[in-house]
Amino acid sequence: MREFSSDFGRSRFLPPEKVVREGEDGTIEEIMREAAAAGQDMTVRGAGRSCNSQTLTRGTVLDNFRDGATPRFTGEDHLVEVPSGITWLELESWLNERGRANPVLPSYLRLTVGGTLSVGGFGLGSIRSGLQIDQVREIEVVDGTGRTHRCSSHENSELFRFALGGAGQAGFIRTAVLRTVAREAAVPVSRIEHGGLHDLVKYLPGVAREPGVGGYFGMYDRNSWYSQVSWTADAAEVPEQAHPVPAYASLLHQEVEQHLSPLLHGETHANLWADYVLDEAGLERFAAALEGLMSESPLTETLISLYFLVVRRPESSIPFAFAPVLDAPVQYGIGVFASAARSDTGAVSRTRQVQRQLLEICAEAGGRPYLYGAHAFDEELLRTFYGASALRGVEELRVRHGLTHFSRRAFGGVRP
């Protein structure tokens, strides 16, 4: 039970009354219906990688992590249908064996498909293909009444728009049908060193305009600033310093997993991670404020790394209600990853205060946060980010579908 009392953030502890699993404790329909009828708070947990108690409750936790789950190809164009409890690592391995791949993958792959789709999902391929939710063609959602809904851009489109990126507020995503692409055995990769935050941020718009770039991330790891660029097979010109890297996504996952191992498997530190998405003007404003904060306590002690992505969504993309997406042709993601000993309550508190400052700056710059993170929302900030109409709409949807006690901590505890 202890495993389900906290999440990756480890700064909040909420022991659940019980943990249930599909099959062992009934069907998903029965589990959802019984919890709603009893007025019992309920949440879904996949890999538990939220950072601010989003997947915690004192009621019922639905454990959706599924080792050995089986995907299947469906329809045309190599679409794949997957259970939401499968990890991206399992899905990517299954696809690779069949000559296919996911167009957008997170750098760490032991996350469940349902978990990342519930908050949006970014990765190296976002520079060409947008978010992971932009690859979704259909989902199956179970609501609090036990009813199942097939949802897509043209069927139950409101549920589709609120469920993907909505942090569980629109029901339990049971399955998803995803776009896939042909697997590349190896891709050319180049690394570009930067002199600091300002230099890296200035580099981003240029790489966003480069048509031959297939993948991108930028990084500050307390030792160096750099960008890593992968190139498409049809790139007109590949830099001389680029070298072919086989199984690139798997290699990055292994590197990230090794780096994260102490944080994933220990309980001594609070992981105060947060990501923000901004347009080009907002990026410059946000980065300028961040640079000042990085030179002061607590970030001089608690900052682990910064992570940068470029996001170019497909044309006519769906305006998901709560996903970290903007009305801009190119968007930029900045992850600010901090960690402090749980016993050092002062460092934890001061880091949270800095994150609140960054959240306010993100709002002022017209950006949006990524909902898995350690964000200190209030009602005013929620209205600024999402608008009164979307907040009212999700509450009305939750009433209609018997979900008023489901995923109540999607915004970290505050409700609109």
Residue ranges and their predicted role:
Residues Q228-A233, L264, R313-A328, E379-L391:
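Short glycine/threonine-rich loop-to-helix capping motif typified by GTGT followed
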Residues A281, A287-R342:
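C-terminal structural cap/anchor segments
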Residues R10-P106, G120-G125:
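Glycine-rich N-terminal segment of FAD-binding domains in flavoprotein oxidoreductases
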Residues H259-P262, L272, R356, I361-P416:
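Activity-critical C-terminal alpha-helical subdomain
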Residues S84, L283-E284, A340-Q353, L359-A363, ...:
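Extended C-terminal subregions enriched in glycine
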Residues S118, R137-L293, S297-T302:
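C-terminal substrate-binding/cap subdomain adjacent to the FAD-binding core in PCMH-type
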Residues G214-Y220, N271, L299-F320, R368-H375:
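A short glycine-rich, hydrophobically flanked beta-strand micro-motif that places a catalytic Asp/Glu
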Residues G99-S107, R147-C151, G212-G215, R368:
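Short secondary-structure capping/junction motifs at helix and strand boundaries
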